Amino acid sequence: MNGPARLALALSLAFAAAVAQSAPLAKGNILAANGIPKGEAPASSLPALKAALNGGWGLAANVTLTKDGRMYLVAAGTVSRILKGGDASKLTPEEMRGVNLNQREGDLDFGDDEVVDYHSPVELEKVAPLIPKAGTVFLHLSNVPGSTEAVAAMVKKRFSEVFKEGTPTNLVVVSNRGNLLIDLGREMPGLKRFHYVVPRGHNKVKGDFLVEAPSVIYSAKGYKADGIMVEYIAGHITPAYVDKLKKAGFEVVLGAVGCGAMPTADAVAASAPEYALAKDPAALYKALGGK
Protein backbone atom coordinates (compact mmCIF):
# COMPACT_ATOMS: atom_id res chain seq x y z
CA MET A 1 0.00 0.00 0.00
CA ASN A 2 1.52 3.33 -1.02
CA GLY A 3 1.67 6.49 1.09
CA PRO A 4 -1.47 8.25 -0.20
CA ALA A 5 -3.50 5.05 0.14
CA ARG A 6 -2.31 4.54 3.73
CA LEU A 7 -3.18 8.14 4.55
CA ALA A 8 -6.64 7.78 3.04
CA LEU A 9 -7.22 4.58 5.01
CA ALA A 10 -6.06 6.20 8.24
CA LEU A 11 -8.35 9.17 7.74
CA SER A 12 -11.26 6.87 6.94
CA LEU A 13 -10.68 4.81 10.08
CA ALA A 14 -10.34 7.94 12.20
CA PHE A 15 -13.61 9.30 10.85
CA ALA A 16 -15.38 6.00 11.49
CA ALA A 17 -14.04 5.91 15.04
CA ALA A 18 -15.20 9.46 15.70
CA VAL A 19 -18.67 8.63 14.44
CA ALA A 20 -18.81 5.47 16.52
CA GLN A 21 -17.73 7.32 19.67
CA SER A 22 -20.00 10.32 19.19
CA ALA A 23 -23.06 10.36 21.43
CA PRO A 24 -26.49 10.52 19.84
CA LEU A 25 -28.64 13.60 20.38
CA ALA A 26 -29.70 13.52 24.03
CA LYS A 27 -33.28 12.42 24.73
CA GLY A 28 -34.06 15.76 26.28
CA ASN A 29 -32.96 17.55 23.10
CA ILE A 30 -35.30 15.56 20.87
CA LEU A 31 -38.48 17.62 20.91
CA ALA A 32 -41.85 15.91 20.65
CA ALA A 33 -43.93 18.12 18.35
CA ASN A 34 -46.98 19.07 20.45
CA GLY A 35 -46.56 15.95 22.54
CA ILE A 36 -46.79 12.24 21.78
CA PRO A 37 -50.30 11.19 20.65
CA LYS A 38 -51.70 8.14 22.43
CA GLY A 39 -54.60 6.25 20.87
CA GLU A 40 -57.42 8.76 20.45
CA ALA A 41 -55.55 11.36 22.49
CA PRO A 42 -54.27 13.69 19.75
CA ALA A 43 -51.30 16.03 19.66
CA SER A 44 -51.68 18.94 22.12
CA SER A 45 -53.95 16.87 24.40
CA LEU A 46 -53.07 16.38 28.06
CA PRO A 47 -52.10 12.68 27.62
CA ALA A 48 -49.87 13.58 24.65
CA LEU A 49 -48.12 16.38 26.53
CA LYS A 50 -47.65 14.23 29.63
CA ALA A 51 -46.21 11.38 27.54
CA ALA A 52 -43.46 13.70 26.30
CA LEU A 53 -42.74 15.42 29.60
CA ASN A 54 -42.81 12.28 31.74
CA GLY A 55 -40.85 10.29 29.16
CA GLY A 56 -37.73 12.41 29.48
CA TRP A 57 -38.13 13.87 25.99
CA GLY A 58 -38.02 17.51 25.08
CA LEU A 59 -41.20 19.24 23.93
CA ALA A 60 -42.01 21.84 21.31
CA ALA A 61 -45.55 23.12 21.82
CA ASN A 62 -47.60 25.80 20.16
CA VAL A 63 -49.20 28.26 22.58
CA THR A 64 -52.40 30.28 22.36
CA LEU A 65 -52.46 33.43 24.48
CA THR A 66 -55.89 34.67 25.53
CA LYS A 67 -56.68 38.25 26.41
CA ASP A 68 -57.39 37.28 30.02
CA GLY A 69 -53.73 36.28 30.36
CA ARG A 70 -54.06 32.51 30.07
CA MET A 71 -51.74 30.26 28.04
CA TYR A 72 -53.02 27.12 26.31
CA LEU A 73 -50.68 24.58 24.72
CA VAL A 74 -52.33 24.53 21.31
CA ALA A 75 -51.96 26.65 18.18
CA ALA A 76 -54.38 29.55 17.90
CA GLY A 77 -54.96 28.57 14.27
CA THR A 78 -55.98 25.06 15.30
CA VAL A 79 -58.60 26.41 17.69
CA SER A 80 -59.94 28.81 15.07
CA ARG A 81 -60.15 26.06 12.44
CA ILE A 82 -62.02 23.72 14.78
CA LEU A 83 -64.50 26.48 15.54
CA LYS A 84 -64.63 27.44 11.87
CA GLY A 85 -63.39 30.95 12.42
CA GLY A 86 -63.12 33.43 15.23
CA ASP A 87 -60.32 34.86 17.34
CA ALA A 88 -58.96 32.23 19.73
CA SER A 89 -57.53 34.92 21.99
CA LYS A 90 -61.05 36.10 22.88
CA LEU A 91 -62.27 32.74 24.19
CA THR A 92 -63.17 32.42 27.86
CA PRO A 93 -62.02 29.39 29.88
CA GLU A 94 -65.50 27.90 29.50
CA GLU A 95 -65.44 28.39 25.74
CA MET A 96 -61.95 26.89 25.49
CA ARG A 97 -63.12 23.83 27.42
CA GLY A 98 -65.81 23.47 24.77
CA VAL A 99 -63.18 22.93 22.06
CA ASN A 100 -62.52 19.25 21.32
CA LEU A 101 -59.10 18.68 19.76
CA ASN A 102 -60.49 15.50 18.18
CA GLN A 103 -63.19 17.49 16.47
CA ARG A 104 -63.25 17.75 12.69
CA GLU A 105 -62.79 21.32 11.52
CA GLY A 106 -66.08 23.18 11.79
CA ASP A 107 -68.05 20.02 12.63
CA LEU A 108 -69.86 20.59 15.92
CA ASP A 109 -72.17 17.57 15.57
CA PHE A 110 -70.60 14.12 15.57
CA GLY A 111 -73.88 12.23 15.30
CA ASP A 112 -75.35 9.68 17.70
CA ASP A 113 -73.43 6.74 16.25
CA GLU A 114 -69.98 8.33 16.40
CA VAL A 115 -67.93 8.14 19.60
CA VAL A 116 -64.93 10.43 19.82
CA ASP A 117 -62.72 10.96 22.87
CA TYR A 118 -62.98 14.49 24.22
CA HIS A 119 -59.77 16.42 24.73
CA SER A 120 -59.87 20.17 25.28
CA PRO A 121 -56.88 22.55 25.08
CA VAL A 122 -54.52 22.31 28.04
CA GLU A 123 -53.64 25.30 30.19
CA LEU A 124 -49.96 25.74 30.94
CA GLU A 125 -50.59 25.46 34.67
CA LYS A 126 -51.76 21.84 34.26
CA VAL A 127 -48.35 20.66 33.07
CA ALA A 128 -46.14 23.29 34.70
CA PRO A 129 -45.05 20.97 37.56
CA LEU A 130 -43.74 18.44 35.00
CA ILE A 131 -41.57 20.86 33.03
CA PRO A 132 -38.54 21.23 35.37
CA LYS A 133 -37.88 17.47 35.28
CA ALA A 134 -38.43 17.08 31.53
CA GLY A 135 -36.08 17.69 28.63
CA THR A 136 -35.88 21.13 27.05
CA VAL A 137 -39.34 22.66 26.57
CA PHE A 138 -39.94 25.15 23.76
CA LEU A 139 -43.14 27.22 23.85
CA HIS A 140 -43.96 28.79 20.49
CA LEU A 141 -46.22 31.82 20.90
CA SER A 142 -48.57 31.29 17.97
CA ASN A 143 -50.52 34.52 18.43
CA VAL A 144 -49.86 38.00 19.79
CA PRO A 145 -53.10 39.50 21.18
CA GLY A 146 -51.90 43.05 21.71
CA SER A 147 -48.74 45.10 21.54
CA THR A 148 -45.51 43.18 21.96
CA GLU A 149 -44.80 45.12 25.16
CA ALA A 150 -48.17 44.11 26.61
CA VAL A 151 -47.77 40.48 25.56
CA ALA A 152 -44.28 40.26 27.06
CA ALA A 153 -45.65 41.59 30.34
CA MET A 154 -48.51 39.08 30.08
CA VAL A 155 -46.11 36.17 29.61
CA LYS A 156 -43.98 37.31 32.55
CA LYS A 157 -47.04 37.56 34.79
CA ARG A 158 -48.36 34.13 33.77
CA PHE A 159 -44.98 32.48 34.27
CA SER A 160 -44.75 33.98 37.76
CA GLU A 161 -48.20 32.56 38.55
CA VAL A 162 -47.64 29.01 37.32
CA PHE A 163 -43.94 28.58 38.16
CA LYS A 164 -43.90 29.34 41.87
CA GLU A 165 -40.17 28.64 42.22
CA GLY A 166 -39.17 30.69 39.20
CA THR A 167 -39.12 30.05 35.47
CA PRO A 168 -37.46 26.66 34.81
CA THR A 169 -34.02 26.88 33.23
CA ASN A 170 -35.05 24.29 30.62
CA LEU A 171 -37.87 26.50 29.30
CA VAL A 172 -37.43 28.42 26.04
CA VAL A 173 -39.87 30.85 24.40
CA VAL A 174 -40.08 30.98 20.61
CA SER A 175 -41.60 33.65 18.36
CA ASN A 176 -41.36 34.98 14.83
CA ARG A 177 -42.06 38.48 16.13
CA GLY A 178 -38.72 40.16 16.59
CA ASN A 179 -39.99 42.97 18.79
CA LEU A 180 -41.64 40.42 21.06
CA LEU A 181 -38.32 38.61 21.52
CA ILE A 182 -36.69 41.93 22.41
CA ASP A 183 -39.46 42.83 24.86
CA LEU A 184 -39.38 39.37 26.46
CA GLY A 185 -35.65 39.81 27.00
CA ARG A 186 -36.30 43.14 28.66
CA GLU A 187 -39.02 41.72 30.93
CA MET A 188 -37.20 38.45 31.75
CA PRO A 189 -33.44 38.89 31.23
CA GLY A 190 -32.59 35.25 31.99
CA LEU A 191 -35.18 33.75 29.65
CA LYS A 192 -33.87 31.91 26.58
CA ARG A 193 -35.54 33.17 23.41
CA PHE A 194 -35.44 31.58 19.96
CA HIS A 195 -36.30 33.17 16.63
CA TYR A 196 -38.93 31.12 14.76
CA VAL A 197 -38.07 30.90 11.07
CA VAL A 198 -40.11 29.69 8.12
CA PRO A 199 -37.49 30.16 5.38
CA ARG A 200 -39.99 30.59 2.57
CA GLY A 201 -41.45 33.76 1.17
CA HIS A 202 -43.41 35.33 -1.66
CA ASN A 203 -43.54 38.79 -3.17
CA LYS A 204 -44.49 40.39 -6.47
CA VAL A 205 -40.89 40.76 -7.61
CA LYS A 206 -39.43 37.35 -6.72
CA GLY A 207 -42.58 35.27 -6.57
CA ASP A 208 -41.99 32.23 -4.35
CA PHE A 209 -38.49 32.20 -2.89
CA LEU A 210 -36.41 30.54 -0.18
CA VAL A 211 -34.66 32.58 2.50
CA GLU A 212 -30.92 32.05 2.78
CA ALA A 213 -28.93 31.72 6.01
CA PRO A 214 -27.37 35.23 6.03
CA SER A 215 -30.83 36.84 6.11
CA VAL A 216 -31.93 34.58 8.97
CA ILE A 217 -28.75 35.39 10.90
CA TYR A 218 -29.18 39.13 10.35
CA SER A 219 -32.73 39.03 11.74
CA ALA A 220 -31.89 36.82 14.72
CA LYS A 221 -29.00 39.08 15.71
CA GLY A 222 -31.24 42.13 15.49
CA TYR A 223 -33.78 40.43 17.77
CA LYS A 224 -31.04 39.46 20.25
CA ALA A 225 -32.20 35.84 20.03
CA ASP A 226 -30.33 33.02 21.74
CA GLY A 227 -31.15 30.53 19.02
CA ILE A 228 -33.14 29.74 15.90
CA MET A 229 -35.97 27.27 15.33
CA VAL A 230 -36.00 26.71 11.58
CA GLU A 231 -38.52 24.84 9.46
CA TYR A 232 -36.95 21.83 7.78
CA ILE A 233 -37.09 22.03 3.98
CA ALA A 234 -35.32 19.12 2.30
CA GLY A 235 -32.65 20.32 -0.11
CA HIS A 236 -32.66 23.86 1.31
CA ILE A 237 -31.99 23.48 5.03
CA THR A 238 -28.79 21.55 4.45
CA PRO A 239 -25.92 20.77 6.84
CA ALA A 240 -24.08 23.76 5.37
CA TYR A 241 -27.10 26.00 6.09
CA VAL A 242 -27.29 24.81 9.71
CA ASP A 243 -23.52 25.18 10.08
CA LYS A 244 -23.74 28.85 9.10
CA LEU A 245 -26.36 29.46 11.79
CA LYS A 246 -24.23 27.70 14.40
CA LYS A 247 -21.04 29.50 13.40
CA ALA A 248 -22.91 32.79 13.83
CA GLY A 249 -23.34 31.86 17.49
CA PHE A 250 -26.86 30.46 17.54
CA GLU A 251 -28.20 27.21 18.93
CA VAL A 252 -30.38 25.54 16.30
CA VAL A 253 -33.63 23.61 16.46
CA LEU A 254 -34.05 21.65 13.23
CA GLY A 255 -37.76 21.63 12.49
CA ALA A 256 -40.46 24.18 13.35
CA VAL A 257 -43.40 23.08 15.48
CA GLY A 258 -46.67 22.93 13.58
CA CYS A 259 -45.03 23.91 10.31
CA GLY A 260 -43.74 21.75 7.49
CA ALA A 261 -42.10 18.35 7.50
CA MET A 262 -40.18 16.84 10.39
CA PRO A 263 -36.43 16.41 9.75
CA THR A 264 -35.25 12.93 8.84
CA ALA A 265 -32.75 11.06 11.00
CA ASP A 266 -30.16 11.41 8.22
CA ALA A 267 -30.69 15.18 8.13
CA VAL A 268 -30.30 15.45 11.90
CA ALA A 269 -27.16 13.30 11.92
CA ALA A 270 -25.58 15.27 9.08
CA SER A 271 -26.51 18.73 10.40
CA ALA A 272 -25.79 18.10 14.11
CA PRO A 273 -28.21 20.71 15.47
CA GLU A 274 -28.52 21.20 19.22
CA TYR A 275 -32.20 20.17 19.05
CA ALA A 276 -34.47 18.38 16.59
CA LEU A 277 -38.24 18.04 16.28
CA ALA A 278 -39.94 14.68 15.90
CA LYS A 279 -43.45 13.29 15.77
CA ASP A 280 -42.00 10.02 17.10
CA PRO A 281 -39.09 10.94 19.39
CA ALA A 282 -38.25 7.32 20.25
CA ALA A 283 -37.89 6.39 16.58
CA LEU A 284 -35.59 9.35 15.91
CA TYR A 285 -33.53 8.62 19.01
CA LYS A 286 -33.08 4.99 17.97
CA ALA A 287 -32.18 5.97 14.40
CA LEU A 288 -29.49 8.28 15.78
CA GLY A 289 -27.95 5.47 17.77
CA GLY A 290 -29.66 5.96 21.12
CA LYS A 291 -30.53 2.99 23.30
Model-derived regions: residue spans:
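Phosphate-group recognition and catalysis centered on beta-loop-alpha active-site segments
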Residues: 21-291
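Bacterial N-terminal signal peptides that target proteins for export
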Residues: 1-8
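Bacterial N-terminal signal peptides
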Residues: 8-18
